[in-house]
């Protein structure tokens, strides 16, 4: 199913109500990472060039349905003004007569930013009345907030009941690349799934399994799979309640002739602490007193080998305790291998995206997804409310 996009509409003189994802990290009122703001620029610039009056809306943080100036979008308005080279007017609310009046005074090419939509509890409740109030500021609804596409909120899907709805360039790109992974991946297709828990990744593992030729499983969840295979995992993370689930998953992989790569050597520690001394274990088995913290050199060699000939790669989740520098090598090396892969490469999920950015490799990846939970749910095959309302 394809989505309607901004290229399908005439925006001249129209009010484009654009849902962006400006949920950026702030420290003492200053933006520490403006990646999400920059990601919205192509859509905003295009709408301006088409003569639209651009009305932007977003959430920021969790103000719990109350007006809390700590979560005001004012810093975003300032940064947008700098990036666009024009004044972006910040409105003091997102609904109401004053907002409608301010929007009605806009000229073609003007850009305004509404205040945080989550200052109203009705936003997350997907209140019909609140969605209707928001819709009064637009003629066409543009959803460019892939990061919140898995939420059925008033500003992400409710507004589409009142206005024609299309996707912005960011939404279109996410749908195109993640959709390609699920619908028609070119073989050999390698899935690399990391993260700490089987429970949080089993749905994406099961969704990608029938499409994959090779599946790499790393991170804390790998130890539950190794336990199923009969190996010693020491004091490593184990989800006993997922032993049967992991066992039937490995059986299914065998039936489908999918090669599953689990760690064959490890970097371990005596305690789960940032400054624990890393030790190398040249074996699949982990000593009883040790905790698996990262994948070892032999495992990395194996992953490098399958990636060198892959035509499609999806990577979601870290391969070790990436937040501790001593145990980040596995994730860092995999980021490098994915970047050097000649095929289509898609990276989604907070830590894997952070790894790619940390080592300045994002320019070598075909597509770096902007959605954490949204990417995961998309790859699980779930219907995302923010995308469903855009479908043709």
UniProtKB/Swiss-Prot annotation:
Metabolic or biological pathway: Carbohydrate degradation; glycolysis; pyruvate from D-glyceraldehyde 3-phosphate: step 2/5
Subcellular location: Cytoplasm
Organism in which the protein naturally occurs: Borrelia recurrentis (strain A1)
A single cellular component GO annotation: cytosol
Family from the record: Belongs to the phosphoglycerate kinase family.
Keywords associated with the record: ATP-binding, Cytoplasm, Glycolysis, Kinase, Nucleotide-binding, Transferase
Gene for this chain: pgk
Protein name: Phosphoglycerate kinase
Enzyme Commission designation: 2.7.2.3
Keyword Kinase: yes
């Amino acid at each position: 199913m394809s989505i309607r996009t901004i290229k399908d509409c005439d925006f001249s003189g129209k009010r484009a109500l654009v849902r962006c994802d400006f949920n950026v990290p702030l420290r003492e009122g200053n933006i520490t990472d403006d990646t999400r703001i920059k990601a919205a620029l192509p859509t905003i610039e295009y709408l301006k060039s088409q003569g639209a009056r651009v009305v932007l809306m977003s959430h920021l943080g969790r103000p719990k349905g109350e007006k809390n100036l700590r979560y005001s979008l004012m810093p975003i308005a300032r940064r947008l003004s700098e990036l666009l080279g024009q004044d972006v007017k910040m409105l003091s609310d997102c609904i109401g007569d004053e907002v409608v009046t301010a929007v009605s005074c806009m000229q073609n090419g003007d850009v305004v930013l509404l205040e945080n939509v989550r200052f109203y509890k009705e936003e997350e409740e997907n209140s019909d009345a609140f969605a209707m109030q928001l819709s009064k500021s637009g003629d066409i609804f543009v959803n460019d907030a892939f990061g919140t596409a898995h939420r059925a909120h008033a500003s992400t899907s409710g507004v589409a009941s009142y206005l024609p709805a299309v996707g912005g360039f960011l939404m279109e790109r996410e749908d195109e690349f993640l959709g390609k992974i699920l619908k028609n991946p070119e073989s050999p297709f390698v899935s690399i799934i990391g993260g700490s828990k089987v429970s949080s990744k089993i749905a994406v593992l099961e969704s990608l399994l029938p499409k994959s030729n090779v599946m790499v499983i790393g991170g804390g969840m790998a130890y539950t799979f190794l336990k199923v295979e009969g190996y010693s995992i020491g004091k490593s993370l184990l989800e006993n309640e997922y032993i049967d689930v992991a066992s039937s998953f490995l059986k299914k992989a065998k039936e489908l002739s999918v090669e599953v790569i689990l760690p064959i050597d490890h970097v371990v520690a005596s305690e789960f602490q940032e400054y624990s001394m890393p030790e190398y274990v040249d074996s699949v088995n982990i000593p009883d007193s040790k905790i698996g913290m990262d994948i070892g050199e032999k495992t990395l060699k194996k992953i490098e080998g399958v990636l060198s000939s892959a035509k499609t790669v999806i990577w979601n989740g870290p391969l070790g305790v990436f937040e501790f520098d001593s145990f980040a090598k596995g994730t860092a090396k995999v980021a490098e291998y994915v970047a050097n892969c000649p095929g289509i490469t898609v990276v989604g999920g907070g830590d894997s995206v952070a790894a790619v950015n940390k080592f300045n490799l994002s320019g070598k990846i075909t597509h770096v997804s902007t959605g954490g939970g949204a990417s995961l749910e998309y790859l699980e095959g779930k219907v995302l409310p923010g995308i469903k309302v855009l479908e043709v």
